[in-house]
Amino acid sequence: MAFNGIERFYVKELKKLEFSSIIELQLAEEELIRDFGTLNTIHNNDSGVFGNIDVQITDLRKKKKKIMDKIYILPPRKEILDSAMNESKIKLDISWFFDNYMDQELTNVMNYFDGEEPIHINTVVLEWFGYEGDLRTQKRKFIDMLKRNSIPYKELTSKEEIELYPTIKEEILSLPHKGAIACSKWLVMKPYDIKIAMLRLNTKNSQIIKQYYIKMEELVRLYAQYTTLFIEKEKEQMSREMNSLQLMMEEMKIANLKQEEERKLDRLMLTESRNMLQTMGIEIKTVKYNNNNLIDQNNELLERVDEVLHKVDVVQTKLNISVEDRAPQPDKNKRRERFLLLKRNDENYPYYTIRAQDINAKKALKRQKDMFSDVTILLDLICHPNTKTFYVRIKDDLKKKGVEFHLCEISIEDSQITEQDLVEAMMKINDEKREIKNEK
């Protein structure tokens, strides 16, 4: 207020706000405090821009297009839950929620801060946090914030273990002389402490980071709610199947009673026929002989029927096994599951998998082509109903051969197989769905 002048301060609009989480309430309080002091917030400042940051820290400077416009508000809860319930007859895992409702570029940036080893906080990271000015000013403001919030950090000198940090070695090469190297210190922090610090930021980019965690928290809650709904739906389906089975058993019981009554009637008629033949003077032995022949023929027919029923039971058992994980294909092509293996011009993870419905797979493929200049489709499979289970099988088999998996990304650099081996292995696992194995 003092910065802009009290005569320019007026109430433009009053709004009633509702918050669904403690984090949202804290963000609103911080924003009000910041507005009351300087009236210079992210809403009044067009400079609130995130860089398009890749997983590697050395790529943070390469792209500067806005990521803020790509961060969207989550759809209504009911819409997300309905979409998840209609997605598959098999229970989804939480990655489906993150893949469909989290901004993938921002997720790739946040994944850089995962792991266990300390990370060098250089000027690229500080600029991404929203700090301005030279490196010394950025570090001073950031360290002041860490001290205020009692967040652990460490400053390394050139005599300490700096070999583990390539970005520190690069900065040393840019220093003018040994004296500057001896006086310099480099800030490193553990990933957990960095995430705590990001939630305490009060910079132009802090809102985007905090909104990311708010969305993630909301999706975790939605996944828990989805799990409850899915279990209830399965119970209802099981109850309907049990009722149908009980009805079938009642019908079989009635049919058996009817057959027993018919057999009693047949025996009665046979007795009456025998008495009638005796009255007519017909030789009983002849009738008995003919009757035995008919009985033998009937028994042969019954044995054949038993053989046919046994074969039907075997076929039914194999059919039950074969359809256990094979749901019917959706009527609409855009709802059918696809599994794609891509090759990209990425040094660390040249191979990338997309596992989604056709409509979402096309969107994911377009995102990859936007991010990388050279994208080739090595494998495209229709993998209904569950591409997630298929991908788990692939990872279980190929990890034994040294293939490295990171979410949807794949590297065979240190493995025992070639690109052709990778494609053939995935096709072989896909073909196993046609094999029928008897359950023991």
Curated annotation (Swiss-Prot):
Belongs to the IIV-6 006L/238R/313L/468L family. Keywords: Coiled coil. Signal peptide: none annotated. Pfam families: DUF3627 (PF12299), MSV199 (PF10553). This is Putative MSV199 domain-containing protein 238R. InterPro entries: DUF3627 (IPR022549), MSV199_dom (IPR018879). Residues 229-316 form a coiled coil.
